[in-house]
Amino acid sequence: MIPEITLLPLPIIPLALVVVFLLLLTLETGFPLRRRTWPRRRRLPVNFALTAGVMAAGLLVVRPLALAASFWVAQRNFGLLRLVNLPTPAMVLVGLVLMDLTFYWWHRANHRFFLLWRFHGVHHLDPDLDVTTAARFHFGEVLYSTGFRVLQVGLLGVDPFTYLVYEAAYQAANMFQHANLRLPLLLERALNKILVTPRMHGIHHSVVSEEVGSNFSVVFRWWDAMHRTLRLNVPQRDIIIGVPGYLSPEHNRLWPLVVLPLRFSKNYWLWSDGTEPVRTPSATPGRPGIIVE
C-alpha cells in the first residue's frame, strides 16, 4: 500500500512555485545580473505563450504518466532503489540525487542529438535570460520528454512522494538559475558549492558554442564537475545570450518558434557574416571552477 504522505505535496507545489516565480521576478527587476538587450514587451508575450503550451503538456501528459509510473513501481517494489533495503528517508534522498543525475544526462542528450536539439533550441533562442525563460520550451520537447520521465521513474523505482518532491525542486531550481539576478559574489560562490546558480547557468546560454556545451546540471552542480563540463570563469558582462544564427526579431516571434523544429535550419552557431563567436583564454580569468563577477 502507498502511504497517504505520498500525495501530501501535491496541493502545495503549484502555489509554492508561483511564489518563487513572483519573488524572483521582483528581485531580478531590482538587481539585474545582465543588461537586457530586448524590451520585455517584445519577449514576454512569446515566452508566456510558449509557457502555456508547456504547462498544458505537463499537466495533461507528463505528470499523469510519470505519477502513474511511480505508483506502479511502488506497488510492485520495482526498480533500482528497491534492490537495497534502505530506510524511507534515505530512499527519498538517494532517489532525488539519482533523478538529478539522470536529468543531467538527458539535458546533454538534448544538445548532443540534432533531432532533439531542433526542439530544445527554442529554449536557447531567447535573446535575453530571465525567470520567464525557465519554462520557454517547445511543447514538442515536453511531450517527447514524457518517455524519458516514465523510464527514469520506472527504472529507478521512484515512489510518488519522491517524484513530486523532485518535480518541485526541479521547477524551483530551473527558475532560480534562469533568473537575471545579481547575487553578491561571495553568496553565489557559497551557494554554487551545491546548487546551480544564475551566473553558472548564464554561461550555458552564451552564443559561444563551447560555453553552451558546459553547465548542464539542473539542481546540483556536482554533475558538471564529475563529467568535466563545469565552466564558471566567464565574466557576465562579456556574455551575449542566445543563438548567433537566430538573434533577429523575425526568429523570435511565436509562430516561427513553433515551426522551427520542422524547418530546414541554417548553422545555429554562426553570425550572419559566417563567423563563429569565440572567447579567447585571456578573456576568462582564474580557474574554470570558480565563479567570477
Regions found by a protein language model. Give the residues of each.
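Short, strongly hydrophobic alpha-helical membrane anchors
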Residues: 1-10
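Membrane-helix interface motif
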Residues: 63-74
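Loop-to-helix transition at the N-terminal end of transmembrane alpha-helices
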Residues: 12, 16, 39-52
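Residue-level signal for inorganic ion chemistry
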Residues: 28, 48, 223
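Membrane-interface helix-loop junction between the first two transmembrane segments
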Residues: 25-44
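Hydrophobic core of alpha-helical transmembrane segments in multi-pass integral membrane proteins
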Residues: 16-26
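Cytosolic-facing loops and C-terminal tails of multi-pass membrane proteins
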Residues: 225, 236-293
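Membrane-embedded catalytic scaffold of the fatty acid hydroxylase/desaturase
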Residues: 52-61, 65, 80, 84-240
